[in-house]
Regions:
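N-terminal export signals
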Residues: 1-35
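Surface loop/turn motifs at the tips and blade-to-blade linkers of beta-strand repeat domains
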Residues: 70-74, 113-116, 161-165, 227-232, ...
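Blade-loop segments of beta-propeller domains
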Residues: 71-83, 87-101, 107-126
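Repeated scaffold domains used in trafficking and secretory/extracellular systems
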Residues: 75-82, 119-125, 166-173, 234-239, ...
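Residue-level detector of Asp-centered blade-edge/turn motifs that repeat once per structural unit
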Residues: 83-85, 128-129, 175-182, 243-244, ...
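Asp-box/WD-like beta-propeller blade repeats and closely related beta-sheet repeat scaffolds
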Residues: 115-125, 136-175
Length: 379
């Protein structure tokens, strides 16, 4: 049953009605093969087809993958999150106006549409207790970042805090204390890029970029710390927690107007609770980190779609090796394995042996995966 907590505009109502009439609800069963995949890993993903945008579950085995079930959404999705009840959350890509809870097992949906002078920036996290959600947002009047504090059951906003920067993007709950920042603190990636509504996603005033990593008190929103990189053109985008090295890896995207400097810019920074430092010794990766995950055994993997490569780094942020993979972006890791998206198939990498790579071939129906994945259900 769909739940609408804010007024539905005619365009929203039209889309929901057309989606039902067109059969764009949950896609259950095995649409690609009748026989089951052997011991698959299931990923929560978002993707595009020629005529629709989707979120859904994808089963991945050693040599093939398939869509398990899916749900059409009104615009391109971005961040996804798996809840303890096996339901999932997805948000529209920035500047977005919808937040969705979907129950893949039953097909039940709960929609929340943001209104007024706010837009979603594509990411959400939950409190450890599961009663609160935090969403990164932008104030359309000022372009300043806001953190929406939401009731997890209703998805309604109960409070709002400043992120102390523009263009807040990813956020994470710090798993354990680092330096003077306590466990449970909210880490926010202020991308630092101004993009007001009249310009859509077009960027402006890049010479005044002010990207930062911010730690906030999860109870009050008070600032616990703020860090910046020396290169002001590096936009801070996405996070990964390395439980081995006890560090936070951050995927970067350069906005440097000088083409050569942009192409050679670092795609990773590492925060240890005290310092925020960029990667060292990396080759040219076109200055664009699409997604990031922790590397089993310690370190990080950063997808570099513009370089058609997966860049592997040590926990100290030193570049290690590149794995070629065309137009790769979405990453996810579980246990001793990690996976990466790409139009040629889903790449899976074995533990501690980064040259042991398997490519699960794409089915006949080609999908264009979006930016992020999660493992479903939660372990």
């Amino acid at each position: 049953m769909a739940t609408e907590r804010t007024p539905i505009t005619p365009s929203r109502r039209t889309w929901l009605s057309q989606a039902v009439l067109a059969g764009l609800g949950p896609w259950l069963g095995n649409p690609v093969w009748a026989s089951p995949i052997e011991a698959p890993t299931t990923l929560l993903a978002t993707w595009q087809t020629p005529d629709a945008h989707h979120i859904g579950l994808v089963d991945v085995a050693a040599k093939r993958w398939r869509v398990n079930r899916s749900l059409a959404v009104p615009t391109r999705a971005h961040g996804v999150m798996v809840e303890s009840s096996d339901s999932v959350l997805a948000l529209a890509r920035r500047p977005g106006d919808w937040l969705l809870r979907w129950h893949p097992r039953t097909g039940e949906t709960q929609w929340h549409w943001i209104g007024g002078e706010r837009r979603f920036n594509g990411h959400v996290v939950a409190s450890p207790q599961g009663d609160t959600l935090w969403t990164t947002e932008t104030d359309l009047e000022t372009a300043q970042g806001r953190l929406g504090v939401r009731d997890s059951r209703s998805l309604e906003k109960t409070d709002e805090w400043a992120t102390h920067g523009m263009d807040p993007h990813a956020l994470m709950v710090l798993p354990q204390a680092l330096g003077r920042i306590p466990a449970g603190s909210l880490m926010v990636a202020n991308g630092g890029i101004s993009a007001l509504p009249e310009t859509g996603r077009a960027k402006h005033d890049l010479g005044r970029m002010d990207a930062s990593l911010v730690a906030l008190n999860p109870q009050t929103g008070a600032v616990l710390g703020q860090w910046r990189l020396v290169d002001s053109y590096l936009s801070i985008r996405h996070f990964a927690w390395d439980a081995v090295s006890k560090r936070v890896g951050i995927a970067l995207q350069s906005e440097n107007p000088d083409g050569a400097q942009r192409q050679s810019a670092p795609v990773l920074a590492v925060w240890d609770g005290e310092q925020l430092l960029p990667s060292v010794g990396q080759p040219v990766l076109q200055g664009y980190g699409g997604d990031i995950c922790a590397r089993p055994g310690g370190g990080f993997v950063v997808s570099c779609p513009r370089a058609n490569a997966l860049a592997l780094f040590t926990p100290a942020s030193a570049w290690s090796v590149n794995l070629p993979h065309r137009d790769t972006c979405a990453l996810v890791a579980q246990g001793d394995q990690w996976w990466a998206s790409g139009p040629d198939g889903i790449l899976s990498v074995a533990p501690h042996h980064d040259n042991e790579v398997a490519l699960a071939a794409a089915p006949e129906e080609r999908l264009q995966f979006d930016n992020h994945w999660q493992i479903w259900p939660l372990a």
